[in-house]
């Protein structure tokens, strides 16, 4: 973000785009997502599916962006079932250590959680691995991670960064590029849940219908 804030004014005839940050400049488009909305749905589904009524969250870095994932998840869970307990969040402190992700997830599973949502980059693959070993559920993030461990990833909270970037390039090619913040929310299809093709039977039609509402 700071690099773009410094560079963009020096090249006023060049168009720039940045993901997950806001840069105010006449030649920069900021691509932002309502992660809290998609995470709300993930938490809602987790609460409906949980048998222990305890849920967990593993984040990467403890920064405002990841706090949006956490807050949405917790709000969704409590909306679905006020009796659900969302255990104190764990943070890996990095985006890469799958071992750390696994340790954090195992600690949450040991505390009674049976669904753990991760927003931890590659470290989150450790969360998914732990879910399989423990016979519990993980929730994937950003892309469709349902296939990573089929049947153990309850769903994935998908951010359509690909669509946002494609739209930006398309706008540029058609001379429709506009600077400023472009927000991709639930209504616009910028965030949402995966198809859950490997877990639909475990979730049940009634719960799936509630999430769609």
What are these regions (language model features)?
Residues 1-213:
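A residue-level marker of the well-folded mature domains of exported/periplasmic proteins
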């Amino acid at each position: 973000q700071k690099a773009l804030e410094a560079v963009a004014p020096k090249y006023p005839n060049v168009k720039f785009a940045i993901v997950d940050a806001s840069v105010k400049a006449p030649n920069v488009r900021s691509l932002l997502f309502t992660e809290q909305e998609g995470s709300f749905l993930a938490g809602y589904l987790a609460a409906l599916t949980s048998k222990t009524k305890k849920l967990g969250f593993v984040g990467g870095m403890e920064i405002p962006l990841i706090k949006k994932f956490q807050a949405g998840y917790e709000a969704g869970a409590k909306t679905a079932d006020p009796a659900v307990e969302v255990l104190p969040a764990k943070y890996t402190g990095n985006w890469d250590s799958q071992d750390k992700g696994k340790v954090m997830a195992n600690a949450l599973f040991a505390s009674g959680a049976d669904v753990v949502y991760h927003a931890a980059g590659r470290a989150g693959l450790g969360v998914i691995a732990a879910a399989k070993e423990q016979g519990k559920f993980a929730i994937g993030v950003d892309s469709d991670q349902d296939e990573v461990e089929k049947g153990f990833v309850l769903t994935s909270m998908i951010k359509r960064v690909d669509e946002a970037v494609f739209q930006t390039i398309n706008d540029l090619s058609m001379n429709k590029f506009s600077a400023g913040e472009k927000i991709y929310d639930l209504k616009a299809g910028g965030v949402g849940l995966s198809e859950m093709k490997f877990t639909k039977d475990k979730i049940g039609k009634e719960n799936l219908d509630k999430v769609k509402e």
